[in-house]
Amino acid sequence: MKSLPEFREGIFVFHPHPILRIFDTERETAMSKFLLVGLGNVGAEYAHTRHNIGFDVLDAFVIKHGGFFKLDRLAEVAEVKWKGKTFICLKPTTFMNLSGKAFKYWMDKEKVDLENTLTIVDDLALPTSKIRLRASGSDAGHNGLKDIQLTLGTDAYPKLRFGIGNDFAKGQQIDFVLGKWAQDERKLIDIK
């Protein structure tokens, strides 16, 4: 099995993980379509903020593999072919807290099984640049994940959580997650 990308010191490195079959080049063609959903907020004021790490990760993946995003129903969408697989990459335009509608629409439209999705999201509970991959699990207080879980009626879908740390004063969580990366953090999360 190929490995899942992991974030480390400003680049993607590879880390084996049994949950996802996305990078397994030996899978049957029938299972070769995947939906990657990066969570974030639309608008220039939110670009490259901690809360938009899902958008940034997808941007890097799509650019690296020669794709481009186009505005479509409920999202910016790109289709990337890589290692014999099709990746539908989705950046919802519904704002973070309403991401479930776009997720469900595109999963149904593209006929992608829930197990062949991956939601990429920021996580305050993880140190900056650390990642966690789970096949299922709670929303951990993340409003984008809450909406997806409510829309799908389950929390049993794969999530890739990128740590953004929690270095903020009491009552400053919103400013922190919607804030731009500090210079020292930027070095850790610079996606290439």
Residue ranges of model-derived segments:
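Nucleotide and nucleotide-moiety/phosphate-recognizing core
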Residues: I22, E28, S32-S136, K146, ...
